[in-house]
């Protein structure tokens, strides 16, 4: 390489540093060797360097977005064992992965006994949304209610609801696994009401909708919740066995292995209301 060539190369290096393109800088020498060997021309080399840099930036973006979404454990649809859950319509799940339900601000309900893959599917769909550049927030129902209760005590409830309403997709995991604290149903109602027809949700539960009155400790609040959550909804029911128990099935008693069907009742025909003396916009605990 001539002196002029070395000078130009150093100028390119400085430019890549100034533009904060570390991957392109890292690949520069190897790319130049490919040009010298006649493997690629200048245009192809430029395309290769830019693609390498873009790939790195996209990887970093996704990693940061997953952390912001609280998706610390990444699951994918590719790793989901559809063969183990024959009751599950794979085509329907893959259609959800196109994320049109997010654009339509719909609620996706994943219902089934424990261990049937509800959280895996919810996480995988959330990961797809992150990759597509959509904002996501993932939490269990217990975590959401605890955060809302804390915000209420600190006089920050409106701000917390506004924060949880910003995400294009809110995933609420494990509805029905833990008892809802007193007043928690009303707090969750306020969040659902704020997101209604504005933001999409994925909700997982091991309890049928008919049991939500028991889950939330108030059938009236449960009806108001279901009124909104079933208005624009997709309901996926999994009637299979537990992934976590399949390798130890012989150790589990038959009455534990048997699954309980979770059949959703028809959606409420009229809009539900919170308890007497409570406004629709600001239920009290």
Q: Each PLM stretch: what is its role?
A:
Residues 88-166, 215:
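Conserved P-loop
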Residues 56, 61-95, 103:
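Clamp-loader machinery-focused feature within the broader ASCE/P-loop NTPase space
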Residues 17, 21-73:
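Interdomain "pre-motor" coupling segment immediately N-terminal to P-loop NTPase/helicase cores
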Residues 11-14, 30-34, 79, 107-111, ...:
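Short hinge/gating elements
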Residues 1-25:
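Charged, compositionally biased N-terminal leader segments and the immediate start
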Residues 21-24, 55, 101, 169, ...:
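Generic structural signal for secondary-structure transition and capping sites
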């Amino acid at each position: 390489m001539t002196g002029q060539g070395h000078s130009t190369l150093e100028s390119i290096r400085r430019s890549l540093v100034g533009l904060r393109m570390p991957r392109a800088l890292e690949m520069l020498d190897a790319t130049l060797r490919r040009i010298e060997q006649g493997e690629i021309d200048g245009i192809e080399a430029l395309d290769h360097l830019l693609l390498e840099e873009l790939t790195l930036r996209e990887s970093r973006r996704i990693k940061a977005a997953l952390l912001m979404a609280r998706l610390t454990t990444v699951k994918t649809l590719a790793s989901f064992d559809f063969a183990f859950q024959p009751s599950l319509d794979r085509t329907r799940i893959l259609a959800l992965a196109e994320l049109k339900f997010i654009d339509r601000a719909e609620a996706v309900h994943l219902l089934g006994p424990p261990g049937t893959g509800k959280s895996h599917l919810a996480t995988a769909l959330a990961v797809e949304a992150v990759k597509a550049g959509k904002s996501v927030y993932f939490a269990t129902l217990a975590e959401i209610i605890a955060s809302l209760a804390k915000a209420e005590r600190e006089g920050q409830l409106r701000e917390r609801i506004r924060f949880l309403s910003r995400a294009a997709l809110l995933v609420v995991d494990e509805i029905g696994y833990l008892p809802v604290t007193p007043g928690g149903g009303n707090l969750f109602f306020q969040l659902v009401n704020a997101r209604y027809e504005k933001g999409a949700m994925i909700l997982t539960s091991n309890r049928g909708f008919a049991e939500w009155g028991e889950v939330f400790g108030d059938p009236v609040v449960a009806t108001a919740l279901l009124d909104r959550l079933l208005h624009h909804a997709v309901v996926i029911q999994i009637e299979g066995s537990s992934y976590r128990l399949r390798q130890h099935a012989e150790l589990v008693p038959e009455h534990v292995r048997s699954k309980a069907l979770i059949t959703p009742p028809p959606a409420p025909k009229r809009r539900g209301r919170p308890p007497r003396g409570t406004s629709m916009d600001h239920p009290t605990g």
